[in-house]
């Protein structure tokens, strides 16, 4: 995906003092693209079951370690499709690397990448791009970047950015049969209702762009049961294992995005709640 020189990035960012994110993004064609690379041949045989992994890559920092995990972890076999979030392209914090492309090259995957944010804080960033991706052992027929309704303006944040949450929607060719895959990143700095509105946008896009095709939805949905802007609630939940348990056992009560998907015929997996780690360990 073609970069934008830093002076132009800063000029576009300054427009956000007066204009909306949607208006400024409309001036940047990269936000409408889904960068797609189909360089891997289709596997010879179609398995009875596909292995699909959801993975927040945390900007692609510690990229080698994340790649080693994908390569060596026996619990994620077979691995056919990865719905990945938070992949940098040209950011100093991740070594200036195109992290999605490097992972695809390492594993011989096809991929589609959608731009979520252009980072403005570090003027030394070669590109400052940050986004989501669908990786696949199977050919990608078509791909789109689906922009989600804004629930938080990231320009007025310490992580000053142009952009907003998005999903990458791809049509895969599984031995001649189509399968849709969506890598979704819902907003953490909003409430459950805000995430529901964003999820419904993805559901409508899948219905419109991939009619009659089975679709797998995944990604960092940020279904945390709280509004990430509310520091008091975050501290209350962090200090109460009992409250954490109640929230985990009834996520759909707080997160309407999940029943919204079920209402459209999707099955939520896993059905049993499980604790996941929100941030990486210091060694990646």
Description of each model-found segment:
Residues 50-57, 70-96, 135, 170, ...:
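Active-site beta-strand/loop signature of hydrolases that rely on acidic residues for catalysis
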Residues 4-42, 87-178:
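Structured beta-strand-rich core segments of catalytic domains in phosphoester-bond hydrolases
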Residues 65-67, 95-97, 123-126, 147, ...:
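Short aromatic-enriched loop/helix-cap "lid" or pocket-rim segments at secondary-structure transitions
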Residues 59-64, 89-94, 191-193:
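Acidic-and-aromatic substrate-binding clefts and catalytic sites of carbohydrate-active enzymes
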Residues 58, 88, 117-118, 185-187, ...:
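Catalytic metal-binding/acid-base residues of hydrolase active sites
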Residues 161, 179-188, 242-246:
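Active-site-proximal loop/helix segment associated with metal-binding centers of metalloenzymes
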Residues 194-284:
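Metal-dependent phosphoesterases centered on the DNase I-like endonuclease/exonuclease/phosphatase
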Residues 62-66, 99, 103, 113, ...:
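Stable alpha-helical elements in mature extracytoplasmic
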């Amino acid at each position: 995906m073609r970069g934008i020189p830093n002076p132009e990035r800063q000029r576009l960012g300054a427009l956000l003092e007066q204009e909306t994110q949607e208006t400024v993004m409309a001036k940047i064609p990269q936000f409408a693209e889904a960068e797609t690379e189909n360089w891997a041949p289709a596997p010879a045989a179609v398995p009875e079951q596909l292995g699909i992994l959801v993975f927040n890559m945390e900007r692609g920092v510690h990229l080698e370690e994340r790649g080693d995990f994908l390569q060596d972890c026996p619990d994620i076999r077979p691995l056919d499709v990865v719905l990945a979030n938070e992949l940098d392209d040209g950011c100093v914090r991740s070594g200036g690397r195109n992290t999605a492309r490097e992972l695809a090259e390492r594993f011989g995957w096809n991929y589609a990448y959608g731009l979520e944010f252009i980072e403005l804080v570090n003027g030394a960033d070669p590109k400052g791009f940050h986004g989501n991706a669908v990786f696949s052992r199977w050919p990608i027929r078509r791909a789109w970047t689906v922009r989600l309704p804004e629930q938080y303006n990231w320009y007025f944040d310490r992580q000053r950015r142009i952009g907003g949450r998005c999903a990458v929607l791809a049509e895969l060719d599984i031995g001649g049969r189509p399968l849709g895959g969506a890598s979704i990143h819902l907003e953490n700095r909003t409430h459950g209702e805000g995430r529901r509105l964003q999820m419904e946008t993805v559901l409508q896009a899948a219905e419109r762009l991939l009619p009659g095709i089975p679709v797998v939805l995944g990604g960092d949905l940020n279904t945390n049961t709280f509004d990430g802007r509310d520091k008091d609630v975050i501290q209350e939940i962090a200090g109460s294992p009992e409250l954490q348990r109640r929230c985990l056992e009834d996520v759909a009560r707080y997160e309407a995005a999940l029943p919204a998907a079920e209402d459209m015929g999707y099955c939520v997996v896993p059905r049993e709640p499980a604790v996941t780690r929100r941030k990486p360990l210091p060694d990646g």
